[in-house]
Amino acid sequence: MAIGLIGRKVGMTRIFNEDGASVPVTVIEIAANRVTQVKTLDTDGYRALQVTTGTKKANRITKPEAGHFAKAGVEAGRGLWELRLADGDGEGIEVGAELNVDIFADIAKVDVTGQSKGKGFQGGIKRWNFHAQDMTHGNSLAHRSNGSIGQNQTPGRVFKGKKMSGHMGAERVTTQNLDIVRVDAERNLLLVKGAVPGATNGDLIIKPAVKA
């Protein structure tokens, strides 16, 4: 079943495999994902599951949200996410059903999507890995500047999309082909090898790897 789930980044640690080697892992908490809507070709033009997870204070829930959750018969969660379905996936899943981390028990690799850490306004060296200029040898003002950004008298302008200084991070990022190290269904935890995007407690979308 190639269906994704919504999880929360707990943090990183390490575990030791059977050979005694240290394996860096990210711990992802995947509480039960409650299905709030099933989208079909007939009604929506495409197939998808809309899910929620976690909890939300009652005074933070808007009336439209409250009605939507009540119609589905599920507890209000901290957000709504939509997971596209390929042909043959998700058959038999109905509104109100719960999806748990054990659906990854037979999967070896996953893709993890999250929002990267925001780093504010950064220069070209940090943002785009530009080469720094000389620290000495006559250079006294342009050690970390971008260098030439223009053309000639023609076209006499800077092309759109030119890599320059600007806002870095806080964008949707996907890390692909992460190995699943352990699936702990009792504690709703998924351990994947390596790092995943975002800060601690950030929401993540975990899907079976498309390039596995």
UniProtKB/Swiss-Prot annotation:
A single cellular component GO annotation: cytosolic large ribosomal subunit
Keyword annotations from UniProtKB, A to Z: Methylation, Ribonucleoprotein, Ribosomal protein, RNA-binding, rRNA-binding
Any GO MF annotation of the entry: structural constituent of ribosome
InterPro entries: Ribosomal_uL3, Ribosomal_uL3_bac/org-type, Ribosomal_uL3_CS, Transl_B-barrel_sf
Modification after translation, per record: Methylated by PrmB.
Signal peptide: none
PTM sites of type N5-methylglutamine: Q153
Annotated GO biological process: translation
UniProt subunit comment: Part of the 50S ribosomal subunit. Forms a cluster with proteins L14 and L19.
Homology family: Belongs to the universal ribosomal protein uL3 family.
Summary of the function given for this chain in its UniProt record: One of the primary rRNA binding proteins, it binds directly near the 3'-end of the 23S rRNA, where it nucleates assembly of the 50S subunit.
NCBIfam families tied to this protein: L3_bact
Protein name: Large ribosomal subunit protein uL3
This protein's encoding gene: rplC
